[in-house]
UniProtKB/Swiss-Prot annotation:
This is Chaperone protein DnaK. NCBIfam families: PRK00290.1 (NF001413), PRK05183.1 (NF003520), prok_dnaK (TIGR02350). It comes from the Bacteria. The modification Phosphothreonine is found at residue 200. The gene is dnaK.
Length: 650
């Protein structure tokens, strides 16, 4: 069997590594570099350039040179982050037929996984050239905060590149593997991995434990921002240069794609230089021209100026750190080591901020560009069975659930649950004789489904006619070791089932995730109220249904006045339920009124049952008491009413 290679598919740079025995080897590409720019150029003669050659020609071919495509992978075109990038990128970002964000080169529409596959293909070839044999299997890394569709899209990119993706592994976890196996320290320790890359930011709290000679890496929590990275730092410098040039020369460079490409290159170079120097000079002759002739750009930028430009970006990384510490159930003082991953962590201001938050110097003995690929290669060796002394326990970054009656988000799997994991729950129908149900799958932390991200939906049809609450529909959530979700629904009576893997039909952006989490905290009280209101409405609906049914069967045994009293109370309850602005107190009062008015009806039902089932008086009495208290029969305890709709056949 061939080797399983480890690939760090980065926003800005990518890297490939393999294990040789217990030694790791980061492989140099055909240009002799250990990292490859994640840049792809589509040439006039249909040639595709990847890496340094693509980067070198980008200034003369800006519209067909694609970079930072990872920021678009698994995302919808409408997302505000995608819309923001449209105005910044020299290449075209377009809307695909399915609503995804795609790109365009030479008039050809390209899906982000298709473009990323070119980089993966280069990584595959780099490994094959070194090993002298074909490579077909890989472990590919993704940001820990990547959602389901982004992971699926990354897996698709691997398949397009001719690789069987044995595992999708989180970048901070991979870096922890590289760090843990490289160090001789014994005993349990907790580490924080602060990963600020080209396009994404992640922080994970990981416990490394020695269990019977086996190193166990357990992720305690993860958090992050999938739209924050070195590209944003570069953009701040570009915006600053454009502003200064406009003040001096009166020319707006933001409309000139050729100039923008040169500015991007210069901004990245200046940023890197300012990590070791206090000042740098950006010198771009013939940057543009107007009626008066050519214009030259010459600008001095100090480290202090750069730090002022990006201060809020650095600050944005701290809140996820705070959340990760809280979710892990640890204190900052419990962290033994802080690992920095990603090229952007070389910036002194970033290191200073990390030291300030964690109260200790971050480790400098981990290569921020290579650690992730090294960890992926180690995981590849574990999966191939060549390494038995490592156990990796990763987590899912966000809660997953389905929408149930009243628009409530019923969580099936909570965030930071160790994966792989599986959870099943029995639900029922909301209407009599409902022939089909629609299962809507959501991801997020809000109590109401509308506040979360809809990942996908599917139908389970052919449910035999039955009263509401009788059919038993088992919904199963299964997250595999790649963090990819599989959902199934099964009618327990007929055995009919339907399963889906959530496909990359929608992208869950970090801004949305952060908004969900922050909103969930800020609006916890409001969410709780909405949930209670939904529960009161559900109780009211159930009571109307069961009381009407009881009236049909036993109403003729009541005096006319009693029956009218119940019908009047029912009418008032129905009116208050129909009114969208009714609050919980109003609904509860009418529910109580119906329950009180129905006491005589309950007694008649009780007497009738006693007469019919004299032999089973005890059992019948218990059932009738339940009916009089609740206004009707209730489904079993383990059955939750779900807000399913009937799917009409054309």
């Amino acid at each position: 069997m061939g080797k399983i290679i480890g690939i760090d598919l980065g926003t800005t740079n990518s890297c490939v590594a393999i294990m040789e025995g217990n030694q790791v080897k980061v492989i140099e590409n055909s240009e002799g570099a250990r990292t490859t720019p994640s840049i792809i150029a589509y040439m006039d003669d249909n040639e595709v350039l990847v890496g340094a050659p693509a980067k070198r020609q980008s200034v003369t071919n800006p519209k067909n040179t694609l970079f930072a495509v990872k920021r678009l992978i698994g995302r919808r075109f409408e997302e505000k982050e995608v819309q923001k990038d449209i105005g910044l990128m020299p290449y075209a970002i377009i809307k695909a037929d399915n609503g995804d964000a795609w790109v365009e080169a030479h008039g050809e529409k390209l899906a982000p996984p298709q473009v990323s596959a070119e980089v993966l293909r280069k990584m595959k070839k780099t490994a094959e050239d070194y090993l002298g044999e074909p490579v077909t299997e890989a472990v590919i890394t993704v940001p820990a905060y990547f959602n389901d569709s982004q992971r699926q899209a990354t897996k698709d990119a691997g398949r397009i590149a001719g690789l069987e993706v044995k595992r999708i592994i989180n970048e901070p976890t991979a870096a922890a593997l590289a760090f843990g196996l490289d160090k001789a320290e014994k005993g349990d320790r907790k580490i924080a991995v602060y990963d600020l890359g080209g396009g994404t930011f992640d922080v994970s709290i990981i416990e490394i434990a020695d269990v019977d000679g086996e190193m166990q890496f357990e992720v305690l929590s993860t958090n992050g921002d999938t739209f924050l990275g070195g590209e944003d730092f570069d953009q701040r410098i570009i915006d600053y240069i454009i502003g200064e040039f406009k003040k001096e020369q009166g020319v707006d460079l933001s409309k000139d794609v050729l100039a923008l490409q040169r500015l991007k290159e210069a901004a990245e170079k200046a940023k890197i230089e300012l990590s070791s120097s206090q000042q740098t000079e950006i010198n771009l002759p013939y940057i543009t021209a107007d009626a008066s002739g050519p214009k030259h750009l010459n600008l001095k930028v100090t480290r202090a100026k750069l730090e002022a430009l990006v201060e809020d970006l650095v600050e944005r990384t701290i809140e996820p750190c705070r959340t990760a510490i809280k979710d892990a159930g640890v204190k900052v003082s419990d962290i033994d080591d802080v690992i920095l991953v990603g090229g952007q962590t070389r910036m002194p201001k970033v290191q200073e901020k990390v030291k300030e938050f964690f109260g200790k110097e971050p480790r400098r003995d981990v290569n921020p560009d290579e650690a992730v690929a090294v960890g992926a290669a180690i995981q590849g060796q574990v999966l191939s069975g060549d390494r038995k002394d490592v156990l990796l326990l990763d987590v899912t970054p966000l809660s997953l659930g389905i929408e149930t009656l009243g628009g409530v988000m019923t969580k099936m799997i909570n965030k930071n649950t160790t994966i792989p994991t599986k959870h099943a729950q029995v639900y029922s129908t909301a209407d009599d004789n409902q022939g089909a149900v629609t299962i809507k799958v959501f991801q997020g932390e809000r109590e109401m489904a509308a506040g979360n991200k809809l990942l996908g939906e599917f139908n389970l049809e052919g449910i035999p006619p039955a009263p509401r609450g009788v059919p038993q529909i088992e919904v199963t959530f299964d997250i595999d070791a790649n963090g990819i979700l599989h959902v199934g629904a099964k009618d327990k009576a007929t055995g009919k089932e339907n399963k889906i893997t959530i496909k990359a039909n929608s992208g869950l952006s970090e801004a949305e995730i952060e908004k969900m989490v922050k909103d969930a905290e800020a609006n916890a009280a409001e969410d709780h109220k909405l949930r209670e209101l939904a529960e009161s409405r559900n109780q009211g609906d159930a009571l109307v249904h069961s009381t009407k049914k009881a009236l049909t069967e036993y109403g003729d045994k009541l005096e006319a006045g009693e029956k009218e009293k119940i019908e009047a109370a029912l009418k008032e309850l129905e009116d208050v339920l129909k009114n969208a602005s009714s609050d919980k107190a109003a609904i509860d009062a009418k529910v109580e009124a119906v329950a009180t008015a129905s006491q005589k009806l309950g007694e008649k039902m009780y007497a009738d049952m006693q007469a019919q089932q004299a032999g089973a008086a005890g059992a019948a009495g218990a059932a009738a008491e339940g009916a009089s208290a609740q206004g009707g029969a209730q489904p079993p305890d383990d059955v939750v009413d779900a807000d399913f709709k009937e799917v009409k056949k054309d």
